[in-house]
Every structure is written in C-alpha cells, then in structure tokens.
Amino acid sequence: MADTDDKKAFDLAIRLLGEREHSRKEIITKLERRKFSEAAIDKTLERLDQLGLIDDRSFAEHFVGSRSRKKPSGKYKLRYELFQKGISETIIDEILSDYDSSAHCLDAAMKKFPFLKGDDHYKRKKLYAFLANRGFDSHSIRETLDQIFRS
C-alpha cells in the first residue's frame, strides 16, 4: 500500500512540474491537499532532489522574470509572493538585489496610462494607487509619475 502511495505522490509531483516549475512548499501543499502521507511526501521530495527537478532558487528566478514581463510588480509585492511560495529570505534577497524597480514601475504605468480617463490630477491619483498596489515603493512611483506627466 505504501509503495503505491509513494508512486502516486511522485507521479503527481512530476505531472505538476511538467506544467510549470514549482517551489518545494507548493509541491508539499499540493500533495498534502491530496491527503498523501507525510512519509510519501518526504520520499517524493527526496527523489525530486536527487533528480534535480526541484530548485527554489531557479523557481524564484523564473517567477521574477515572468512577473517582470507579464505583470510588472515592485520588490515589496514580489518579496511577499515569493515568501508565500516558501522561498527563503536569503534567496529572495539575492534574486531581488539587482531588480530595477524604477524601470518596471515605468513599464507598468505606461501599460495602464492609456486606459485612464479624466483630468491629470485624477489620472495621477489613480496611477499612484495602481502602482502602490503592485508593490512599488513611493520613490519609484513619484519618479515615474513625474516622468509621465512632464511630457
């Protein structure tokens, strides 16, 4: 019985990793939701480690890169999301150390700006709230708004 449970847990983990890269915590959470035993989960993680299929650093790099392209976010939001996915503070700090918040802030603002209606004061207020919600720091937001409304 335990062997089939181990195999099912491993097969599910492989299927999940085939869809996209996952953090260690995500794999654990998804296996726990399916009611796999702690022993089966531990064996699955051990096998995934041996095969080099689970790597939190690689996951974090891909996650930040994907976010940067699809839905630019600030360091605060990225830090929170990575922490929620079980990435260690050390890895998060290393990955985000060379993240250019100002460039991504401008990119996010330029994508949103054409859809804003109203006078400049209203647009500025809405854009500030949008960027703050995306996790950008106030300094980057002010620089971006000054750059947009200067032209």
Swiss-Prot record:
Listed InterPro entries: RecX_HTH_1st, RecX_HTH_2nd, RecX_HTH_3rd, Regulatory_RecX, WH-like_DNA-bd_sf
Main location per the UniProt record: cytoplasm
Subcellular location: Cytoplasm
GO terms for biological process, alphabetical: regulation of DNA repair
Superkingdom field: Bacteria
UniProt keyword annotations, A-Z: Cytoplasm
Coiled-coil segments: none
A single cellular component GO annotation: cytoplasm
Family designation: Belongs to the RecX family.
HAMAP family assigned: RecX
Xref: PANTHER family: REGULATORY PROTEIN RECX FAMILY PROTEIN
Role summary: Modulates RecA activity.
Name listed for the protein in its UniProt record: Regulatory protein RecX
